[in-house]
Design a protein with these regions (language model features):
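Short glycine-/Asp-/Thr-/Trp-enriched loop segments that recur within the blades
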Residues: 22-25, 66-71, 114-124, 167-172, ...
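Repeated scaffold domains used in trafficking and secretory/extracellular systems
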Residues: 25-31, 68-75, 171-176, 223-228, ...
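Asp-box/BNR beta-propeller loop motif
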Residues: 2-21, 45, 49-66, 95-114, ...
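Short, solvent-exposed loop/turn segments at conserved positions within beta-propeller repeat blades
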Residues: 42-45, 88-92, 142-144, 194-199, ...
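Oxyanion-binding "anion nests"
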Residues: 172-204
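Entry beta-strands of beta-propeller and related beta-repeat scaffolds
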Residues: 36-38, 80-84, 136-139, 183-187, ...
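Loop-centered beta-sheet repeat module
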Residues: 114-160
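Residue-level detector of Asp-centered blade-edge/turn motifs that repeat once per structural unit
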Residues: 32-34, 77-79, 132-134, 179-182, ...
Length: 279
């Protein structure tokens, strides 16, 4: 599994590779606090690694040995507290949390999580199916059900809310989301096996995800792999990338304009309202 980091002033670039008993881990999520990078690999092994930013030492800090383990994302709320999540085990989402700067991780018991439907899972969508904002957390699902799992207290209590996004097929549902603040959010996805279908694939919430309204139904892009608000723009400007190209909205997602034919991009990261990195 390859990883690396760079500084925008070009003062330092670093790349490396991690092996697990000669196996190359498949990384699906990356997060950081001030001192360390954290990498989560999907399965066989499902492991969280910590990389020291100064001396570049690598430490395996968590391993899920459940044969059904498959991890999709990792984020940090603050310097001390972080969350990683994966596909269901024992009827509930897999959620692990750290409260000590990533030194130890504890799995949330299924009794404290909403029950998953058979065939419902989360997608490993370039780390954008797990969103944190302040103390708030959202996890996206698809398959038989396309729902949003929500916590207002950094993963201690959870609720699940239905969405109108297309669902009922193994590769359909919510793949990506972003929240402008703790109330206004957007979800996107669709049917990965019918990527030109632009119906029921994007929706907006103004109440933290408790209810959702479809946006531009039957218009704009089809399947979206990543959607993001432009920061510091009042929650009005939004960008989506996926196999149909790059799309832009300047009216909270009611209308979309194609601004690039690049179909090879999978994820977006805004540095500020002017600079964005797309991969």
């Amino acid at each position: 599994g390859k990883y690396g980091f760079c500084r925008f002033d070009k003062s330092k670039n670093y790349t490396n590779q991690i092996l697990f008993d000669s196996i190359k881990p498949h990384f699906r999520g990356i997060a950081q606090n001030k001192a360390s990078l954290f990498l989560v690999s999907t399965e066989k092994p499902a492991v969280i690694y910590k990389v020291d930013k100064n001396n570049h030492s690598v430490t395996k800090i968590f391993e899920d040995k459940n044969p059904n383990a498959f991890y999709n994302g990792i984020q940090f709320w603050n310097e001390f507290e972080g969350i990683a999540m994966g596909d269901p085990q024992n009827g509930c989402l897999t959620v692990v949390i750290t409260r000590d700067k990533g030194q130890t991780w504890e799995k949330v018991d299924c009794s404290n999580l909403p029950k998953m439907e058979t065939g419902e899972a989360s997608f490993a969508a370039s780390n954008s199916s797990l969103i944190v904002k302040g103390n708030f957390t959202w996890i996206l699902t698809g398959g038989t059900k396309a729902r949003v799992f929500y916590s207002a207290d950094k993963g201690r209590n959870w609720s699940a809310y239905d969405t109108p996004i297309t669902q009922g097929k193994p590769m359909a549902g919510i793949f990506s989301a972003d929240f402008y603040n703790d109330s206004i959010g957007i979800i996107a996805g669709g049917d990965y096996e019918n990527q030109h279908d632009n119906s029921k694939n994007k929706a907006l919430t103004i109440n933290s995800g408790q209810s959702w309204s479809l946006l531009a139904d039957g218009q704009g892009f089809g399947y979206s792999s990543c959607i993001q608000f432009v920061p510091e723009c009042g929650g009005i400007l939004i960008v989506s990338v996926g196999p149909q190209g790059i799309y832009f909205s300047d009216d909270i997602g009611s209308f979309w304009k194609k601004i690039s034919n690049d179909t090879d991009l999978h994820t977006l990261l805004f540095i500020d309202k002017i600079i964005v990195i797309a991969l």
